[in-house]
Amino acid sequence: MTAPWGILRVLPQVPDTEPSYDRRSFVAWLGSLPFVGRYLSPPPAPPITIDASPTPLYQQPDGRRNLVRVTVTGLDAPAARARVTDRRGALVGTAGLLPAGSAAGAGFAGEVWVPLSEPSDFQIDLEVGKQRVARRKVRLAPPRRWTLYWLATNHTDVGYTDLQERCLEVHRKNLDAALARLAAHPDFRWSAECALQVLSYVENRSPAAGDALVQAIRDGKVGFGASFANMLTGILDHETLARIAWPAGRFAREHGLGYLSAQLTDVPGQTLTLPSVLAASGVRYLATGPNPERALPLLPEAEATRIGLTGEWTAYPQLYWWEGPDGGRVLHWRAYHYGDALRFGFDVGPDAMARRLSDWLLTNPVFVSPGYPYDVALLYGAQWDNALTDERLVDNFEEFRRRYAYPRIVAGRAEDFFRDVERRFGTKLPVRRGDTGLYWEDGAASTAAELARYRSAQLAARATELLALWDGKTEAADADGAARIRRRADERRQIWRDLLLFGEHTWGAAESVSEPEGRQTVAQWEYKRRFLDGAAAALEQQLAEGLLRIGRASAAGPGRLVFNASSWPRTDVLRLPGGAGRRLVSDGREWPAVDLPDGSALVMARDVPALGYLALAERAGTPNPPQDGGAGLEAQTGSFHVVLDPGTGAIHSLTGGDGRERVKSGAWSGLNELVYVTGGAASALWTDGAREHLAAAPELRVATARLASARRERLPGIGTRLVVARTLDGFPALTSVVTLYDDLPWIDIENRCTKTATLEKEALYVAFPFAFLNPTVEVEVPLGRMTVEQDQQPGSCRDWFCHTHWVWLHEGADGVLWSGPDTPLFTLNDVVRGQWRRKIAPDGSLFAYAMNNYWHTNYAARQGGEYTCRFRISLLGAAPGGDAAEPVRRGWAACEPLHVSPPYTNAGAGPLAAQGAALAIADAGVLVVGAKPADDGEGAVIKLLDVAGTARKVAVGPAAVEFREARRTNLVEMNGDAIGVGPDHRVTLELPARGVAAARLFTPPQAAG
């Protein structure tokens, strides 16, 4: 068996003298006497042992001499000396040996520089005073000569440690210091962890300072991370994740910069499509520093052992190619935590650095394993959250370099490290696929109402970009029209920035739970919420005005415009504000509508074009309110039959046209059962900062809603609904509505509740026990889909998951598609009980994870008020050869409404037809992630995603967007090669299976450039 790297046991000891036989016999005889042996005889002295261990430290200037650590046990003396000679007997060096600790038996230790360029033999003589008391011969092998790249950067929390703007000012000051430091330390590289640091600097410093930073980035003297901020990727929609590097890309385009790397710090895991998105945004390298707080499987073994836990743990660091579903990949370094400069003593001095780095390199299980044959590693980060740079780190780093040739520490950018690794080891590195765990996303459910609004706002932002593609046809072709177009484009860019900032991982103050009424807690949450409030207000106006511009350019007379932002034609219900008693007419046919008590109307919209609109006439109609069907627990409409549980009001039975029961009998009474869980403080739920509590099982109290009343209403021309009043402790008001449709292949569920705020630990779930035994569970994630367990890396989160628009459970040919428009979070099999699963086998039960306050920091301590959570269920089998895109179509329809304009009246006909589309894409297996006017005004940019699972060519034709030329682009609108436009005026894009493709379409009279 080979010894660990750099450590070899010494050869057997040869004592100086042999004790006489007579003395040995006497001692043995004396020890055999019962009385004397027990009470008078001293214990035998332990043998003296000598160990010699090379360290990773090599001396300047040439790195030929290695610092060898000599340890001695069994020596009864206050101090000693070790003389080291080579195989020729020449003295190599002498080490003074001092007690290694205060504990008994701690032994002695000392260090000596030894020439060690190859495996060599040495002799160590142990001396006390002038007497040699022991000798050992050893064979030492040189450890690896390590190169450690130090990614000097400080973590960005937009808040948490202080008010948000103060935190950003800290990072601006750090960049000030980085620029000022270059004159005296030209080889030192500071890095901006994320693009937000750089953007904030340029926007708030003088133009000269901004130019200096841009030049330093251009010259490679300051690192530039491409990720906008440290995002919660699981709560992002498709287009939002596609924009994770968009602010960096836009800044780079405008300033003639490039980038290769991205960082994500603190957030412990990301969705499996992130490498595809980064690769499609020009990023080749990714460095992450996960914080395993409330991500128990990501704890390293040493930390888990310290707090008395057993199980499978995560080894750090990790170095691998992370590959997305489409084959796009990034070279990924995954560190344990961040702030490595403090961890390794850069703030203390070179001696502490040498000791801590040596211990890490010699004892880390990853480094001593055969699976890490490399001699290079990354030190991730400088200090902790929002810290001002400590210049001692730089001084001690440089002093260390003067003393030690190895480990060679290079203060470099992330790409400096990765380029070295790729050049030397790129083809040998392992490839991994799958997500790394969406652990921290559950904290967003501490503000469930805002999370629901955030999901809606992301889709609305995408819709406003689509509507802007008609600007050239609805605005005057003059300076005023151009100015209005630019103003709206600027506002949309700010909307996207606000939406990205709301999806950033900092939700509030460090003391948000311990001091829920504290100044920092209140002020930081108000600031955070303004990102959402501002974006939502601007979106409401942009949507209304965009719809009206198109509507007012269409047919004469009173009308409304209905817009479908999804990639496929839609027939669905829509809510018509102020529409009671009014009817929409398309091609002479009146759409079915039911007048609702709030003055709106529920309308059945039919055949609205993909990425397009219908301009409809509006006229007065015959009143058509819901028809009261009396008390009832049962409804049958279209192909669905629903029966409510008389105790809970949940859906006890759901059958479709085949008569098969879709509800599993057992622990839960039915679908849409509201489950309120309280308790769990100081337990394995990890609800406080003391990790010692993690071994304690939570004591949970589980309550379910109770039925108060149920009535049936007929919606003439549309369907039937059950309106259910329910009671639940902690919820003063609770109403559920289950709607079945005459012609639509799904049922809709809406739960409207009023919640009482409490600081007690709590969670709200909505149970959906589907009648499966061992289903496959596919989940739509941003820009892709994943299969639970199959597409998850070791240590990934199995206790909860995030979906973008749908979850598909299927077994054999049977299947159910579930969507939760208002919450991305769900669990499988059970509610959260602090199990921290390493594996999961789905059993068919799904729980919307609507609310919780389990976090002990950052997220909200309590929530109350009005809250609505909606769900859509459709029966969708998984027959071989079926339409792989159908879950995407139905899931999108569940989450994004058909957009309808305010009423308008046109004096005459406008230039637009009664219906139109932004673009013509016949391929039904393509999702248009986004289509928008280009940031620089040069044409339009379209981003496509394959949802059919096959690589192919996809044709894109003109409609509202007209073009003569096209170029490939990446997701951040950087131009690539030209694409030919065919005689049919269509352009063809190569779309990888499960992948993205983007193009710039140039509109006349612009030329490709």
Predicted regions and their residues:
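Mature N-terminal, pre-catalytic/accessory segment of carbohydrate-active enzymes
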Residues: 2-155, 1005-1009
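CE4/NodB-like, metal-dependent polysaccharide N-deacetylase domain
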Residues: 241-280, 359-380
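Catalytic grooves of carbohydrate-active enzymes
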Residues: 324-552, 565, 749, 814-903
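C-terminal (or distal) subdomains of carbohydrate-active enzymes
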Residues: 57-63, 274-279, 288-291, 318, ...
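Alpha-helical scaffolding within the catalytic cores
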Residues: 134-136, 174-177, 204-217, 243-246, ...
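Metal-dependent polysaccharide deacetylase catalytic core of the NodB/CE4 family, i.e.
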Residues: 158, 186-188, 192-265, 328-334
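An acidic-aromatic substrate-binding cleft motif
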Residues: 133-171, 177-182, 188-189, 228, ...
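Surface-exposed loop and adjacent secondary-structure segments within mature catalytic domains
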Residues: 211-220, 271-345
